[in-house]
């Protein structure tokens, strides 16, 4: 591993935040000259110590995995990204998900709408019904609870409203609104097309080709109770969050720093795809910028100036926000619990990590500039982990 005191300082600053109880992060260059990992804090209250090999919940980084599996199947002819959702799932199952002013536009929604967040569908997890709490707020306030895919869809149908009509799919100026409903539906599509579980699809189409041996998915049918006993705790403010039933309902994914490095590098280089890097380039085109949200949910989900393509984020600050030391752009994905996988093309760097805090979704974006500056000053001396 590489000795990197500047990155150690970044790690310590994150751990020093009042809302961060542990942190694990890694940075590696394409040529291996910089290869650093570090961890601080305990796995859970009372120990043991968190290590750079401890599995953790990756949150919405699973969207990058879902998109990768989708593109693998598309280039093999198993599905068509421009095919309608109702061609892959029972029309009765999805009917009424996108109704505005009495008009049901659900049948216009394609898989491409879902994977690019241009469907306009409400977010079953984060959006609030009129006079009520979001599903994630209910979980945080009332305790662990579970639901089926169809129960989540019924919530969208009966209690929430779409944000905008389904957009013109290939229009670079199309509206984009982050919604967990989009990718919940895509997971159902993956299962319908392959007649396999989501976990099996991920394992066969993504994890195995990329050598991700320590990544697993929990679900209502496959709880992985023994493996869950060893994962890093999630936190909600000052309290640990024990929500195994909720995590199984969302097909929660757990991984390690090493596997997340393998994921971001492998996808960017196109290793799972028959078309190689050219397929990834299609995933990453076009990028559209999220709008500015002003509701409570906007504090947790990605917004301006983050851009989105097909399950891939890009983050680059507008020049007017950083006129003198603008950090280079990164692509990858983040999660609402303060998780990140970033690839920086200009520096050929991969950056991954977690703070496991449900209030820390913005942390990766706020810290990225400091991390990239630290990598410029890091000397390639070979030593142990941080």
Q: Where in the sequence are the language-model features?
A:
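Catalytic loop of the DD-peptidase/beta-lactamase superfamily, centered on the K-T-G motif
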Residues: 1-42, 53-57, 87, 174, ...
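Short secondary-structure junction motifs
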Residues: 20-22, 76, 80-82, 173
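Catalytic-site signature segments of enzymes, centered on catalytic residues
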Residues: 35-36, 53-55, 99-103, 123-223, ...
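Active-site helix/loop module of the DD-peptidase/beta-lactamase fold
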Residues: 52, 57-61, 75-129, 188, ...
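Active/ligand-binding-proximal structured segments within catalytic/core domains
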Residues: 65-66
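A generic structural signal for nonpolar/aromatic side chains embedded in well-ordered alpha-helices
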Residues: 114-115, 156-157, 283, 375
């Amino acid at each position: 591993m590489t000795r990197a005191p500047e990155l150690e300082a970044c790690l310590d600053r994150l751990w020093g935040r009042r809302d961060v109880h542990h942190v694990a992060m890694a940075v590696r260059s394409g040529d291996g000259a910089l290869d650093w990992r570090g961890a601080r804090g305990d796995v859970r209250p009372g120990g043991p110590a968190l290590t750079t090999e401890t599995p953790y919940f990756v949150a919405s980084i699973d969207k990058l995995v879902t998109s990768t599996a989708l593109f693998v199947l598309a280039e093999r002819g198993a599905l068509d990204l421009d095919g309608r959702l109702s061609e892959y799932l029972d029309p009765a199952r999805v009917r009424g998900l996108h109704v505005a002013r009495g008009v049901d536009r659900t049948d216009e929604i394609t898989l491409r709408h879902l994977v690019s967040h241009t469907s306009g569908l409400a977010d079953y997890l984060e959006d609030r019904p009129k006079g009520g709490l979001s599903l994630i707020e209910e979980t945080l306030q009332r305790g662990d609870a579970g639901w089926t895919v169809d129960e989540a869809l019924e919530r969208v149908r009966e209690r929430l409203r779409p944000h905008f009509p389904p957009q013109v799919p290939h229009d670079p100026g199309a509206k984009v609104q982050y919604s967990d409903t989009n990718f919940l539906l895509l997971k159902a599509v993956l299962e319908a097309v392959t007649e396999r579980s989501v976990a099996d699809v991920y394992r066969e189409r993504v994890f195995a080709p990329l050598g991700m041996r320590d990544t697993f998915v929990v679900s209502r049918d496959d709880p992985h109770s023994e493996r869950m006993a060893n994962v890093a705790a999630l936190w909600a403010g000052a309290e640990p969050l024990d929500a195994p039933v909720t995590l199984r309902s969302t097909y929660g994914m757990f991984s390690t720093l090493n596997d997340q490095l393998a994921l971001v590098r492998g996808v960017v280089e196109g290793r799972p795809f028959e078309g190689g890097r050219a397929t990834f380039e299609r995933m990453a085109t076009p990028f559209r910028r999220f709008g500015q949200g002003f509701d409570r949910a906007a504090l947790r989900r990605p917004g301006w100036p983050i851009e989105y393509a097909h399950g891939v984020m890009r983050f680059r600050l507008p020049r007017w926000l950083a006129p003198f030391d603008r950090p280079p752009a990164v692509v990858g994905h983040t999660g609402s619990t303060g998780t990140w996988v970033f690839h920086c093309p200009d520096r050929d760097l991969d950056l991954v990590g977690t703070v496991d805090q449900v209030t820390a979704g913005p942390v990766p974006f706020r810290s990225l500039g400091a991390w990239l500056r630290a990598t410029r000053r890091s000397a390639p001396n070979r030593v142990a982990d941080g």
